[in-house]
Amino acid sequence: MIEHLGINTPYFGILVSLIPFVIATYFYKKTNGFFLLAPLFVSMVAGIAFLKLTGISYENYKIGGDIINFFLEPATICFAIPLYRKREVLKRYWLQIFGGIAVGTIIALLLIYLVAITFQFGNQIIASMLPQAATTAIALPVSDGIGGVKELTSLAVILNAVVISALGAKIVKLFKISNPIARGLALGTSGHTLGVAAAKELGETEESMGSIAVVIVGVIVVAVVPILAPILL
């Protein structure tokens, strides 16, 4: 019966990812962004549950899943659009922007490591967690290169983004951060794509700065994590 569902075709993996994503997006908007209905989070949980309940192997899903994964990298390039729109702001405050993002990213990496050793995680788990500050498209190859588990890295990236999506804007308001540049950088640095989505709700400048942060954080993770990993692990 299951064989007739086309599980050996790319369409299967794509639909298993796309259907819950579309449904979750609808309800996420209807509930004004209730964090447990974040589309990425729901898609991940629904996909795992479906494969587990049906007994279909991950390899069958991966045929279509790899196609989605392929488009992650070119999709990341789209962050250059809002960056271009706010290029004058970038030119004017480039030192503060790059400095703030760099400090925030390094602190995030060190905090991840401290939490990991506090709970006595193994080196493979630590290696999987270190790249989570970047988007999935960047974090996965970095994780693979330092001996991490890509699936665990993907989970860490998504959970991190969901938390920032849910609480990021509230934290910004709690600390009374009124500068749109600072707000956008904070959300983009800590929550990557979903952080940018949260920044977009605050304003165009916040969205642009969040997009800039995502790009720069990715560059820092690619450059720094492979150097830090042999030292920390």
UniProtKB/Swiss-Prot annotation:
One of its GO terms (biological process) is cytolysis. The keyword Cell membrane applies. The chain crosses the membrane at residues 5-25, 33-53, 63-83, 97-117, 152-172, 212-232. It is found in: Cell membrane. Coiled coil: none annotated. It is a multi-pass membrane protein. InterPro entries: Antiholin-like_LrgB, CidB/LrgB. Its main location: membrane. One of its GO terms (cellular component) is plasma membrane. Keywords: Cell membrane, Cytolysis, Membrane, Transmembrane, Transmembrane helix. Inhibits the expression or activity of extracellular murein hydrolases by interacting, possibly with LrgA, with the holin-like proteins CidA and/or CidB. The LrgAB and CidAB proteins may affect the proton motive force of the membrane. May be involved in programmed cell death (PCD), possibly triggering PCD in response to antibiotics and environmental stresses. Belongs to the CidB/LrgB family. LrgB subfamily. This is Antiholin-like protein LrgB. It comes from Staphylococcus epidermidis (strain ATCC 12228 / FDA PCI 1200). The lineage of its organism: Bacteria, Bacillati, Bacillota, Bacilli, Bacillales.
